[in-house]
Every structure is written in C-alpha cells, then in structure tokens.
C-alpha cells in the first residue's frame, strides 16, 4: 500500500508540475510536490539519508536540466525570466519528488546498475516528450539529437541516484 501511495503521490504532483506552466500557473506544481514531500515524510518518517538524497538531487537535477537548456535543444515554460537560463522551480520540484521514489516504489531497482541505465535511457526521453506534449517544454533542432541527449542524461542519472542513495545509507 505504501508503494502505491508513493507512486500515486508522485504522479499527481508530476502532472501538476507539467501542466502548471502550460496554463500560466508554474508554481502549482511545486506546491503540489511540497504537499507530497510533507505527506511522504509524515507517513514514512524523516530518515536523514532520504532527506539528504532529496536535497542532493534537487540541486544536481536543477544543474542537469539547466545544462540541457543551455545546450539549446530544449526550453522550459514557467521559467524565472527570459534572460536567466536556469531550470524552473517546477523542474527542481520534480527532482525532489523523484528522489522519494528510490527507496519506495522504485526500490526494486536498487543494486541493478545496468537495468537502471537502460530504464533511464528509455523512460527519460518518454517523460520529457510527455512534458512537451503538455506544453511544459519545447524541443529545438533535430529530434534525434534531443532524444540522444535525454537518453544519455537519464541513462546516467538513474544509476547515479541509486549509487548516491547507497552511499548515504551506509553512513
């Protein structure tokens, strides 16, 4: 039951994060994700390694998505301003929520580097394509290049989050 609540809470918050920018309400998603975070920690307890994982990947994920935006292959709606190219708050919120899946609904992937790499390389581009379809992001240039970038980024990011999680749990 906890795993189901975990994935449903993330999915609802993910939708709010992606739809919010397309309806000119970019902060509704981060608010929904904050509610998910608070509910998660009140339901599951405040484990320090999980809190650290959320903080690390909120920062790292924002940097990763900012670098992808700087590549010129994608732009985000609901940004802070047109002059500043930093991944928007709703992206940071999604990274926070995604980190909460690692020890719960996606715990089955722990210790499975190759499976995490393949899953990330496939699911990452699909999730971003869904975001484009809902108006949260726009792709520019050759779609093969965009897909390759997203596959590489997520093929590396998913195993990385499990590796970091493992190190945090060992402390």
Residue ranges, per PLM feature:
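Aromatic-rich, lipid-facing transmembrane alpha helices and their immediate juxtamembrane interface loops
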Residues: 1-171
